[in-house]
Amino acid sequence: EVETMAHYRGAKHFLPDVTTILDIGGQDMKCCRIKDGAVDDILLNEACSSGCGSFLDTFARSLGMDIGHFAKIALSAKHPVDLGSRCTVFMNSRVREAQKNGVSVADISAGLSYSVIKNALYKVIRLKKASDLGERVVVQGGTFYNDAVLRALELLLGREVIRPDVAGLMGAY
């Protein structure tokens, strides 16, 4: 409860009429719905890291890259590969298949960024379509320091969201 309220206080500081907080960290993610100035609903994913920052970091390291460079090259992707939003085991095989087919690292990195967001939106939050996330969205958690993940969310939503410069610290606000 205390952490959830910290996330809400932090989001409200950056966007007073926030309606949705999407927090993706290294190991878990949460979505808080705000209604009439109070936390109305909380959705959590703590069982699987396939939609979290550690998932991306592991892939970057497997290619001998740090996560910053891995994210940066994703922004230059021409054709992000569709890797779905399944568990890490399935994702590993899809990435290997893409590599065998000559897909660029940039397109794989961008595809993984989309996978993180699709996992959050469609598996954890269980939206029918991305636009159902809400109109006034604040993103939090260290995963959103990754510009490719942020951009994937904004492209799927069709609009910008608010990412505070202290996104990874919002749970302690």
Indicate residue ranges for each PLM-predicted region.
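Acidic-glycine-rich active-site phosphate/pyrophosphate-binding loop
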Residues: 25-35, 86-96, 143-158
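Glycine-rich phosphate-binding loops at beta-strand->alpha-helix junctions
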Residues: 115, 128-156, 167-168
